[in-house]
Amino acid sequence: VLVLGDSLSAAYGIRLEQGWVALLQDRLESKGYGHRVVNASSSGETTGGALARLPRALERHRPAVVVIELGGNDGLRGLPIADVRANFESLIRLSRDSGANVLLIGMRIPPNYGATYTKAFHELFGELAAKHRLPLVPFFLDGIALDDSLMLEDGLHPNAAAQPKLLEMAWPKLEPLLKR
């Protein structure tokens, strides 16, 4: 299972072993899955940066599943939606062409760039999931982002207490892909 993500998957601000990706490895082992988790996440990562790194990661790890948890940094920087969409399309195509199943994890952004951009960004994940028939976690921080007890002081990143909740957001969509 290759997790291609940003700071939310790279355990930003907490110990790596507290992050949801490390908890995913524990869950797989406890449930008897033979899958190994490779965390190819990087704080500050964009879809473009991940796209540059993906071919080598696919070749090196040959994943059965690729989890794409990206887009937040693209949105926070106001990158053109068409470019972000094209990057996601390429990430999905490369992953699928390698033989992997894909899970798309959606993100939302604050309305810094206006309602039109914010709406287009939010809708992008559902559109990609529908077009490519992908399982989708619509908003990874649902029930977390607005709860101060689950966020670091920066208000952007989930804390250690939030990590089991992030795993529970992803698990129902991820587990069926492990059985294919």
Q: Regions from the language model: what does each represent?
A:
Residues V1-S43, R53-R62:
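Serine-esterase "nucleophile elbow" of acetyl-processing enzymes
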Residues G44-G48:
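Acidic-and-aromatic substrate-binding clefts and catalytic sites of carbohydrate-active enzymes
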Residues L23-E29, Y33, G49-R180:
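Alpha-helical cap/lid subdomain in secreted, periplasmic
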